[in-house]
Amino acid sequence: MVMAAKKGPGPGGGVSGGKAEAEAASEVWCRRVRELGGCSQAGNRHCFECAQRGVTYVDITVGSFVCTTCSGLLRGLNPPHRVKSISMTTFTEPEVVFLQSRGNEVCRKIWLGLFDARTSLVPDSRDPQKVKEFLQEKYEKKRWYVPPDQVKGPTYTKGSASTPVQGSIPEGKPLRTLLGDPAPSLSVAASTSSQPVSQSHARTSQARSTQPPPHSSVKKASTDLLADIGGDPFAAPQMAPAFAAFPAFGGQTPSQGGFANFDAFSSGPSSSVFGSLPPAGQASFQAQPTPAGSSQGTPFGATPLAPASQPNSLADVGSFLGPGVPAAGVPSSLFGMAGQVPPLQSVTMGGGGGSSTGLAFGAFTNPFTAPAAQSPLPSTNPFQPNGLAPGPGFGMSSAGPGFPQAVPPTGAFASSFPAPLFPPQTPLVQQQNGSSFGDLGSAKLGQRPLSQPAGISTNPFMTGPSSSPFASKPPTTNPFL
């Protein structure tokens, strides 16, 4: 400008020429500021206060680049900061030199040199109040301030990025600078660490190759199992029975005696379970012989016999409730089991003719009637050669007049029961005195108006030789029939 002023011939030529040179110089400095905020330093692209991208202002007080919002907050501090717009103001040479010596990176080292992110938090840029409080802590109170003489600013070269210089404040550095000179040791460690991995993979693959596959072992085991049963893959293994050997359904097991004997449903003269009489000569309870002429007590289960001629009220009741016992064998049954009473083949106890005759244990009676309990008084019976009249004993059929005796059907269950223990005899067998036992009806007229002839079976499941009681007629000696 001085040179232009000297050359100007006129009085106003130097002023116009100096103004133009001033505008040209300011344009050069403004372009330099834009370069600083654009591409010369990467840290200047973001706001120093809120880290927002797109800086528009320059803080001449501290030498940083900020956004529009933070520029207004900086003006409100005490003392207020001097802020200029990058595109709408002019800059002088000292200002540009100061901005070149500072910038956001150097300002961070100075004003945030003692800042610890673990104890302090950067406020959110969307909350202006918190940002203002943060700026007051930073600039007014200088809470994290570090003197500039301890921080060296970056050196700039035209058209190139600046290289920061080591300072007292730690900053983010590459891994190579942290490790130092023996940096290749990291690669060596990586190679050594990768080597055991590869070796382990090799060992694992080798172990897998040496081990047989699991399905082959299973297949071998199954082949061995098939070989044990003869090599037939379709043969079923012979398994031992889980339970004891029991006969098949319907089979018969050998009789063991007692309650578990089920031979009553099969053929043969074996003893039945319920209500069967023992064979002749095998009475359950044999009474001991007593002297002749004495009255013999009946064993358990037998009822003493009462004479028919003695006028005994109990005998009358017994004769009223049940018919007379036939001379022949009367089949008696309880619970559907076949059992036949021998024809007056009771066990004779004693040796005299005056002793009473008792029945062996095992005979059963009708469950609807009770046996007549008479005292064993010996008496003379004109209808019996031994002088005794048989009475209804335990196990003998003595149905009352209200319960007619039913004749069993001719094919219901007769085939499934065994043969009678004693051969049946013809009903109305003549005794030694020439009269049958059925003549008792004539001896006691009026006491048994609905009596039936002797010899009719009371077992509904046995086939008897007599016909139906409704078809048969009583003897003609009864005046009521």
UniProtKB/Swiss-Prot annotation:
Q: Is Metal-binding found in the keyword set?
A: yes
Note down the stretches annotated as region Disordered: 150-220, 271-309, 431-481
| Residues of the signal peptide | none
Q: Would you kindly state one Gene Ontology biological process term found in this protein's UniProt entry?
A: spermatid nucleus differentiation
Q: Which GO terms describe its molecular function?
A: GTPase activator activity; zinc ion binding
Q: Does the keyword Acetylation apply?
A: yes
- Note the PANTHER family from the entry: ARF-GAP DOMAIN AND FG REPEAT-CONTAINING PROTEIN 2, DRONGO, ISOFORM F
Q: What is this protein called?
A: Arf-GAP domain and FG repeat-containing protein 2
Show the taxonomic lineage. Eukaryota, Metazoa, Chordata, Craniata, Vertebrata
Q: Which gene encodes it?
A: AGFG2
